[in-house]
């Protein structure tokens, strides 16, 4: 019996060694942790339960039958983050460069199936050279099996991808279908075709970092939701994100202890809005002063900065935040911000996370670039996302809410539950200057008369009270009481029940 137990320990030690000490050292020299080191940092200490440690590939071509390491280049299992269950796979670059084989894919599919059955998130730590060429079509089939599970799990359990090394070719499509993608600066990259292929086909010379590095995907392509300096920071931030999220669409997000007064008065908010209507201010200041303990987890902060998305807590409960940012493009909606916010709203709705919308939007960004790029359909995505959402929705208009953008930003007409406005709010078809130039075109030559007309328009329409008279605004509130009013609103909506008409699925304007 003793010999059998010792053999088990020996086999485990070999499996845990991955590709061997030399390759582990090479991994460390690149500034990267190993697959198992990453899992140890991600999960609560001692909570990891591994599956399929001894699985080996079945390929016999190209001499592969003589090289069959245990685990086949991926570590899979489950554990806990702050006591809550998650499933995880971590690709091992020290074994065949983390390349995906048939059995490698089967290990990933197994934990994804278990995650869906048991209602727990899946976190993928990606560090792979792509498909294992020696296995040919079997490797491609493995990718497709994973893709299908990504699709089936979408909206059922949170899926998080962390790119911690190469992720190229077919490998990119699995992360692309997950809810969140995060990257590590300087050591990770994602692209469908690499620099060599790009050069061959287009004669364009580009580095892997320029083509698919963290900066590219967080600032330009919007493929990634965030980037971190190293593996340790990335894994810490993933733990923090998971703490905001429900385990599945069948369970609520966790309620965490809070020590912040719900009725806290923030007098500084009474002077947040500048006297000059064209002067910007930082909407993040309002978000931080509403949130419990000023804790805000921002999503896609480096992309489409004219709109802010992320998570806060109110009375310990998770709330998704969408807010126009007057500091960038005056808070205008455009193609990128509409796509960014629409995807975030749909995630929140899929997982029953209430949505707080903070509005200061002068309209949609004009220009041929926007029109040629399809701003009509992209803007409709955000409109569609808000309109179909059945979760509690609370909206606060701080300053401008003009034209169609007013409708889009979680207005009362899109089944907003509580729609508040500050006294500084201006809810109108357009600003006073544009309106008077259209309404009183014949008087444009008389500057004094036009100025008087503009002042008349401002007094009559550029305020929250016309909308409040019609019931489109539930209450005009004092800025300093925003946290209290918003918290009370969400508290009253905890038992909200709202269902959309039965359909196979919607047809959002993609």
Curated annotation (Swiss-Prot):
Q: Does the keyword Glycoprotein apply?
A: no
Which first-to-last residue range defines the signal peptide? Answer: none
Q: What is its EC number?
A: 6.4.1.3
This protein's record includes keyword Nucleotide-binding = yes
Describe the subunit structure. Probably a dodecamer composed of six biotin-containing alpha subunits and six beta subunits.
Q: Origin organism of this chain?
A: Cereibacter sphaeroides (strain ATCC 17023 / DSM 158 / JCM 6121 / CCUG 31486 / LMG 2827 / NBRC 12203 / NCIMB 8253 / ATH 2.4.1.)
Q: What is this protein called?
A: Propionyl-CoA carboxylase beta chain
Report the transmembrane regions from the record: none
Catalytic activity of the protein: propanoyl-CoA + hydrogencarbonate + ATP = (S)-methylmalonyl-CoA + ADP + phosphate + H(+)
Tell me which residues make up the CoA carboxyltransferase N-terminal domain. 1-257
User: Could you tell me which pathway this protein works in?
Assistant: Metabolic intermediate metabolism; propanoyl-CoA degradation; succinyl-CoA from propanoyl-CoA: step 1/3
All residue ranges annotated as the CoA carboxyltransferase C-terminal domain in the record? 264-504
A Pfam match is Carboxyl_trans
List the InterPro entries: AccD/PCCB, AcCoA_carboxyl_beta, ClpP/crotonase-like_dom_sf, COA_CT_C, COA_CT_N
Please state which protein family the record places this protein in: Belongs to the AccD/PCCB family.
Keyword annotations of the record: ATP-binding, Ligase, Nucleotide-binding
Q: Where is this region: Carboxyltransferase?
A: 1-504
Q: Which GO terms describe its molecular function?
A: ATP binding; propionyl-CoA carboxylase activity
**Which top EC class is given?**
ligase
Relate the induction remark in this record.
Transcriptionally regulated by PccR. Expression is dependent on the carbon source supplied: transcript levels from acetate- and propionate-grown cells increase 6- and 10-fold, respectively, when compared with succinate-grown cells.
């Amino acid at each position: 019996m003793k010999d059998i137990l010792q053999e088990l320990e020996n086999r485990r030690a070999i499996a845990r060694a991955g590709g061997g000490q030399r390759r582990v050292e090479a991994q460390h020299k690149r500034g990267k942790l190993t697959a198992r080191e990453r899992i140890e940092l991600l999960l609560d200490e001692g909570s990891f339960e591994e599956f399929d440690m001894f699985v080996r590939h079945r390929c016999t071509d190209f001499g592969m039958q003589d090289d069959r390491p245990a685990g086949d280049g991926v570590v899979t299992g489950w554990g806990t983050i702050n006591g809550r269950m998650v499933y995880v796979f971590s690709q091992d670059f020290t074994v065949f460069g983390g390349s995906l084989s048939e059995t490698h894919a089967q290990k990933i599919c197994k934990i994804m199936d278990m995650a869906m059955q048991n209602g727990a998130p899946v976190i993928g730590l990606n560090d792979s050279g792509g498909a294992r060429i020696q296995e040919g079509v079997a490797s491609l089939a493995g990718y497709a099996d994973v893709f299908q599970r990504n699709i089936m799990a979408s909206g059922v359990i949170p899926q998080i991808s962390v790119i911690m090394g190469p992720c190229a070719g077919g490998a990119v499509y699995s992360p692309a279908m997950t809810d969140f993608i995060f990257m590590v600066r300087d050591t990770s990259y994602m692209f469908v075709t690499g620099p060599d292929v790009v050069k061959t086909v287009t004669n364009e010379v580009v580095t892997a970092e320029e083509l698919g590095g963290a900066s590219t995907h967080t600032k330009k392509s919007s493929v990634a939701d965030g980037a971190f300096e190293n593996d340790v920071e990335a894994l810490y931030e993933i733990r923090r994100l998971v703490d905001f999220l429900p385990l599945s669409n069948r369970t609520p997000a966790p309620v965490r202890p809070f020590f912040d007064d719900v009725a806290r008065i923030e007098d500084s908010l009474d002077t947040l809005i500048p006297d000059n209507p064209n002067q910007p201010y930082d909407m993040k200041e309002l978000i931080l002063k509403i949130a419990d303990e000023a804790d805000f987890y921002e999503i896609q902060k480096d992309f489409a900065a004219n709109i802010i998305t992320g998570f806060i807590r109110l009375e310990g409960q998770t709330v998704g935040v969408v807010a126009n940012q007057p500091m960038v493009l005056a808070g205008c909606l455009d193609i990128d911000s509409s796509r960014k916010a629409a995807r975030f709203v749909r995630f929140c709705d899929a997982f029953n996370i209430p949505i707080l919308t903070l509005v200061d939007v002068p309209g949609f960004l004009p220009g041929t670039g926007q029109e040629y790029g399809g701003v009509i359909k992209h803007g409709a995505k955000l409109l569609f996302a808000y309109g179909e959402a059945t979760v509690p929705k609370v909206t606060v208009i701080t300053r401008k809410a003009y034209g169609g953008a007013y409708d889009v930003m979680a207005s009362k007409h899109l089944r907003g539950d509580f729609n508040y406005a500050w006294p500084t709010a201006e809810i109108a078809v357009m600003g006073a200057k544009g309106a008077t130039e259209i309404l009183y075109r014949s008087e444009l030559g008389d500057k004094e008369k036009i100025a008087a007309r503009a002042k008349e328009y401002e007094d009559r329409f550029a305020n929250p009270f016309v909308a409040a008279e019609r019931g489109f605004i539930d209450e005009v509130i004092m800025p300093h009481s925003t946290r209290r009013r918003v918290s009370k609103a969400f508290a009253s909506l905890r038992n909200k029940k709202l269902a959309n008409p039965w359909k196979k699925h919607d047809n959002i304007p993609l």
